[in-house]
A protein has these predicted regions:
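Generic detection of intrinsically disordered/low-complexity segments and helix-coil linkers/edges
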Residues: 35, 40, 61, 82-85
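Generic hydrophobic, helix-prone segments enriched in Leu/Val/Ile
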Residues: 27, 53, 91-93
Length: 99
């Protein structure tokens, strides 16, 4: 993974909250929007940036597109501590729970 685009993509609190939300689940834009109380328009922009940076993968399910954390980036430490491993650095996602 190229760390610079990934770090740029993670340099915004809403995107870190999205990563935390998607760490354990696959969700569509509407579900993410509802859980984070952020407009669908803004969530869509964040998801595009994160997908282009290689942080997220998508899967088509009917008319919906489901988003998830990219394979190989998810790690668990200790007791269910979600950690995002970019190769160059790691992020503890437990601090970025949906509000």
């Amino acid at each position: 993974m190229d760390c610079i685009p990934a770090l740029k993509a993670l340099g915004e609190e809403t995107r870190l909250r999205i990563m935390r939300l998607l760490f354990d689940d696959q969700l569509n834009v509407t579900q993410i929007s509802e859980r984070l109380h952020v407009s669908i328009y803004n969530i869509s922009k964040h998801l595009r940036i994160m997908t282009e940076a290689g942080l997220l993968e998508t899967e088509k399910s009917g008319k919906q597109r489901l988003y998830r954390v990219a394979d190989g980036l998810k790690h668990q430490m200790g007791r269910d501590l979600p950690v995002l491993d970019l190769g160059c650095c790691t992020f503890r996602l437990d601090r970025f729970l949906p509000k």
